[in-house]
Amino acid sequence: MEDLSTMQCEACRPEAPRVSEDEIRELHPQVPDWEIIEEDEVRRLQRVFKFGNFAEALDFTNKTGALAEEAGHHPAILTEYGQVTVTWWSHKIKGLHKNDFIMAAKTDQLLKH
């Protein structure tokens, strides 16, 4: 399978299908540090990133925000002292789409730059 971090998001329409269990088994190994959670009956990808201080956490938050704006796909972001929690899901379909796995992989790449 193509590296998720090099892929582009596609426009997600309300009638788009959520990823299947088979697709999750195929995609999740590329973003192994992301947990699949369920909140308000909606499956999401979530990861907590650790940093040495608030300034580093805020810098990562801003980079994640810029990435989201560029892709037109936006996560929930919680910035705290020394950590940032990023949660991806597709609002229009109330669940996980391939775009969420792509954006999780791209978010991971921010740590490498």
UniProtKB/Swiss-Prot annotation:
<comment type="similarity">
    <text>Belongs to the pterin-4-alpha-carbinolamine dehydratase family.</text>
</comment>
<protein>
    <recommendedName>
        <fullName>Putative pterin-4-alpha-carbinolamine dehydratase</fullName>
        <ecNumber>4.2.1.96</ecNumber>
    </recommendedName>
</protein>
<dbReference type="GO" id="GO:0006729">
    <property type="term" value="P:tetrahydrobiopterin biosynthetic process"/>
</dbReference>
<keyword id="KW-0456">Lyase</keyword>
<dbReference type="InterPro" id="IPR050376">
    <property type="entry name" value="Pterin-4-alpha-carb_dehyd"/>
</dbReference>
<dbReference type="GO" id="GO:0008124">
    <property type="term" value="F:4-alpha-hydroxytetrahydrobiopterin dehydratase activity"/>
</dbReference>
<dbReference type="InterPro" id="IPR036428">
    <property type="entry name" value="PCD_sf"/>
</dbReference>
<dbReference type="InterPro" id="IPR001533">
    <property type="entry name" value="Pterin_deHydtase"/>
</dbReference>
<dbReference type="Pfam" id="PF01329">
    <property type="entry name" value="Pterin_4a"/>
</dbReference>
